[in-house]
Amino acid sequence: MDMFSLDMIISDPAAEASRAGKKQLRGVQNPCPSARARPRHKSLNIKDKISEWEGKKEVPTPAPSRRADGQEDYLPSSTVERRSSDGVRTQVTEAKNGMRPGTESTEKERNKGAVNVGGQDPEPGQDLSQPEREVDPSWGRGREPRLGKLRFQNDPLSVLKQVKKLEQALKDGSAGLDPQLPGTCYSPHCPPDKAEAGSTLPENLGGGSGSEVSQRVHPSDLEGREPTPELVEDRKGSCRRPWDRSLENVYRGSEGSPTKPFINPLPKPRRTFKHAGEGDKDGKPGIGFRKEKRNLPPLPSLPPPPLPSSPPPSSVNRRLWTGRQKSSADHRKSYEFEDLLQSSSESSRVDWYAQTKLGLTRTLSEENVYEDILDPPMKENPYEDIELHGRCLGKKCVLNFPASPTSSIPDTLTKQSLSKPAFFRQNSERRNFKLLDTRKLSRDGTGSPSKISPPSTPSSPDDIFFNLGDPQNGRKKRKIPKLVLRINAIYEVRRGKKRVKRLSQSMESNSGKVTDENSESDSDTEEKLKAHSQRLVNVKSRLKQAPRYPSLARELIEYQERQLFEYFVVVSLHKKQAGAAYVPELTQQFPLKLERSFKFMREAEDQLKAIPQFCFPDAKDWVPVQQFTSETFSFVLTGEDGSRRFGYCRRLLPGGKGKRLPEVYCIVSRLGCFSLFSRILDEVEKRRGISPALVQPLMRSVMEAPFPALGKTILVKNFLPGSGTEVIELCRPLDSRLEHVDFESLFSSLSVRHLVCVFASLLLERRVIFIADKLSILSKCCHAMVALIYPFAWQHTYIPVLPPAMVDIVCSPTPFLIGLLSSSLPLLRELPLEEVLVVDLVNSRFLRQMDDEDSILPRKLQVALEHILEQRNELACEQDEGPLDGRHGPESSPLNEVVSEAFVRFFVEIVGHYSLFLTSGEREERTLQREAFRKAVSSKSLRHFLEVFMETQMFRGFIQERELRRQDAKGLFEVRAQEYLETLPSGEHSGVNKFLKGLGNKMKFLHKK
C-alpha cells in the first residue's frame, strides 16, 4: 500500500533503531519500502540497538485487520504503529536535514501529529490519555529515542516499566514547579474530542488517514496540500477499520488502565509555557490550538486566523496570538498590544477602547498593562487636577499633555492623535481614557504632580467669562458703541475719576468725614449751604402736600392685561349761536357705554367732557378751510389717584366739497406708545375717507385684540370693501421712550444753559410752564423734556397742551409740567403764581424763575453735560451706526441718540451704583440702604444733591420699582450702569480712610510679631 509518497518518506536517525528491528514486519505491511531508508541502517549506535531488541521481545498478538477487499487479516498492531511512526519520523527528518526548508515551529507542529498517530494502536492508553506527554520545555533530540521507544511498547509490563521511568524523569526535571490540578486537557473530554474531530475529517475531505489528515491538514494548508483522489481512496479502504477499533481501545485503556492512578500529570504552567512557544511563526497555531478550540466546529470549517487589520475574535484565546513570539511575558504583552493598536490605526473610525474590550477580555499575564490606561468613561472631569503647559494665544490654544495616554501607546495611534488639534484631541480622549497615575509619571520622568495639575475651568475661548471689576474684560464681553465711549470720556475728563465705595466700606465711614481730591471744598460757602438747606426743606414740604403717585412704569405693568385702549372718540367744531366762536363737541364715541364702577364712570365722564378741550385747545381761532394737512399730537390726562391716560389725536379735514372745519380722531389709552396708535390712526383715516361707518368695526377689532407685550406684534383682521379681509400688524417696541420725541425742536427753542436749568428744576419736582404759539412745538417740547429724565418718570401733573378754559390749574401747589399757548399768557399773568419756572419757547428765555436753577446740579457733572450738548451736532454726524441697541423706533435720529445717551450717563454718574446697596430681607424683599448709598459717593456736591433728590417722588418710585422688579429685567439704564460699575476699582478707599486702614494693617502686622 502506498501510504506515503516517496517525497514524504525520509529517513531519520532517531527512527533507525525501530527500522532495524522491524524489517520483517515492515515488509509485511509495506512490501515496497523506500530505497532512501535502507542506507541509513548501518548508522545505529548501541543505545538504539538495545532499544530495538527490547521492542522485539514484546511482540503482541496479532490483531484482525480488514483489507480493502473486505477480508480480515491478522496484522500485528506494532506494524500499523511502525508504519505511522515511520511516516511521521521521515517528515521530521526532512526538516532537520535541511532537504526542505522549514522552521522550528513547523517541526514542532508535525511532532504534534506524531503524538496523535499513536491513537491507531489497539491499546495506546498512555498515548491518547496523555496526548501531550512528549511536550516538554526541554524539547530536543535527546528525548526522541525515549519517545520513540514509548510508542513501540504494547505489553502491559513493558508499558508500566517505561511509565515508572518517565515518572522518575519527570520528578527529577520538574521538582521546582508548583503542582497544579489537572486542567481541561486531562479530563475525559479530550479523547472524544479528538475522536470526533478525527472521524469527521475523513468524511469531509473524502477519506484518508485520520492521523495524518487531522494533524497535517490545517485550515491554512488546505489550499496547497490537498490529497489526490487516488491516494484518498487508497487510504479510505485500508485505514477506516483500524481507526474505529483504536478509538474503542483508547476509551477502554484510559478508563481501566491500572497504571493511570500512578501517573502524576505534568504541571500546567509548564504545558502553558510549552504550547505558547510552539506555534508557527507564519501565523499557524501551535499545539494548544486544538485544546483551546473545543467548542468550535470541525477543522475544515474553521475560519483562518484573524488578520491584524481586524480585532481578534473573542472566542480565540490570547495564547494563539502570543505563540508567535518569545516566551517572555513582557514581549508577549507588548506585541499583543502593538498588534491590536495596528488594527485600530488601520481602521481609525473604530473606537480603540471598544477594540481592546473585544480582543483582550481575558488577560492572563502577571500584571495588566491596561489598568492604568483604560477605564469606562467618567462623568466627572478627568482633567480636574491637571495643569496645562500650553499657553492660550488669542483664539488658538496649544495644550501640551505630558501625561497624555497617547504617550504610552505605539506610534501608530500617537501620530494619528497628534494630527488633530490639541483641544479637540483633549475632548475626544477624555471619553475613553483616564490619566496615568502621577506617581508613575514622576517615575518615568514625564511629569510630576506639581506640574500636571490644570485648572478645572474649560480652556475653550468660548467658555471664558469676564469678571466684574475688570474694565478690559468687561469691554471685551460687551461691545460698547463708540458714541457711548466718547460721552464717557468727556465725563471723565471734565469731572475726573469718581470713586464709589462698596457697601462694607460705606458702613465703615458712616461716622467719619469723607473728603478727597474730588471734594469741592471751595464751593462750600455759607450761601450755597443755605440754598441747599432751603431746597431740602421745600422738597420735603411739597412731598407732604402732594399725593404719592405710583410710578408710571409700575402702572403700565399693572395694566398689561387690560385692553389696548379705553375709548375712541371723534371731536368736531360747532357753533351754538350765530356769530359766536366754535365749540368742540363729541360727535362719535366707542364703546357707547363704559363698563366700569360708578367711581370710574364718574371720572371717565369728567374726562370725556375735558377731551374735546384738549383736542381743540385753539377752537376759537378756527375758521372753515378748503385744504388742510392732517397733523398728529398727543396729550396726557392725570387722574385723581395719579393715574395717567394718553390721548393720541389725528386732526384732519373730512371729505366733501367747499370749505370745511377739521375734526379730530382721538384714542385714549393707558399705554404710552405713540407709534402703535399712530398706525391705528392711519387705518382710521383710510376708512373714514371711504365711509364713516367703517371706523367702528375697525375699532371693535382692535379692542378685542390682546394686549401686546414689549417687542411683540399682534395681528388684527378687518374687512375693507374692495380689498377683502386685511391683516393689520401692530408692534409694540422694546423701548418707546424716544417715540414722538423731537429734540431738534427743543434745542431750537431753548439754549443749552436754559435747557439744563429746566432739567434741574424738573429733577427737584418744581412747577414748570412752557409757553409756545404753535400746538405742535408745545407738544414736542413737553414730550422731549419728559423723555430727558429717563430712567425716572414724571409722577405729577403733566399737561402738554392746556386749554385756556383750564388755565387756573397752574395755581395748584403740587408739581406740574404744563404747556400753554401764547394766547393764554395774559390770563396766566393775572393768576397768583408761587415758585414756578415760566419758559418762553418762542424767545428762549425765562419769564419767571427762582434764581437758583443754575446751582442745583453738581458743578462738574453739569459742565460735562453742557459740553456734550454743545457738541451734539458733531457727535451726531459721527454717529453712523444706526440705533445703538436696536431699541429705538423708526423715528429715532442720531441727534436723539446723542442727547439721550448724554443724560443717561448723567444719571449713571449719580445713582448708577444703587444695585450695590439693594439688600434682601427676611421675606426676600429687596430694600435700599439709603444712607450707605448716599455716603458711598466721594464728591461732596454730589452727596448734597443726592440728599435733596432722594426725597423726591420720582426717586422713590424709581427705587420702589427696582425693589419689586425681577433681577434679570434690564433696560438701557441698567446696561449702562453695569458697564460703569465694571470700570470702577474694587475695594479702593480714598483720602484719610485709605491711610488709616493701611496704618491699621501695619499695626496688626507688628502685633503678630
Swiss-Prot record:
One term of GO molecular function: guanyl-nucleotide exchange factor activity
Species, as recorded: Homo sapiens (Human)
Protein name (record): DENN domain-containing protein 2A
Record's subcellular location: Cytoplasm, Cytoskeleton
Cited SMART domains: dDENN (SM00801), DENN (SM00799), uDENN (SM00800)
Residues of the signal peptide: none
Domain dDENN: start-end pairs: 872-969
PROSITE patterns tied to this protein: DENN
Domain of life (superkingdom): Eukaryota
InterPro entries xref list: cDENN_dom, dDENN_dom, DENN_C, DENN_domain_containing_2, Tripartite_DENN, uDENN_dom
One GO CC annotation: actin cytoskeleton
Pfam families: dDENN, DENN, uDENN
Chief site of localization: cytoplasm
Domain annotation cDENN: ranges: 737-870
Entry keyword Repeat: no
Compositional bias per record (Polar residues), positions renumbered to this chain: 503-513
Protein keywords: Cytoplasm, Cytoskeleton, Guanine-nucleotide releasing factor, Phosphoprotein, Protein transport, Transport
Biased segments, Pro residues type: 297-314
Residue stretches making up the uDENN domain: 566-715
Region listing for Disordered, in residue ranges: 15-153, 171-334, 434-479, 498-532
PTM-bearing positions, type Phosphoserine: 551
GO biological process: protein transport; retrograde transport, endosome to Golgi
Function: Guanine nucleotide exchange factor (GEF) which may activate RAB9A and RAB9B. Promotes the exchange of GDP to GTP, converting inactive GDP-bound Rab proteins into their active GTP-bound form. May play a role in late endosomes back to trans-Golgi network/TGN transport.
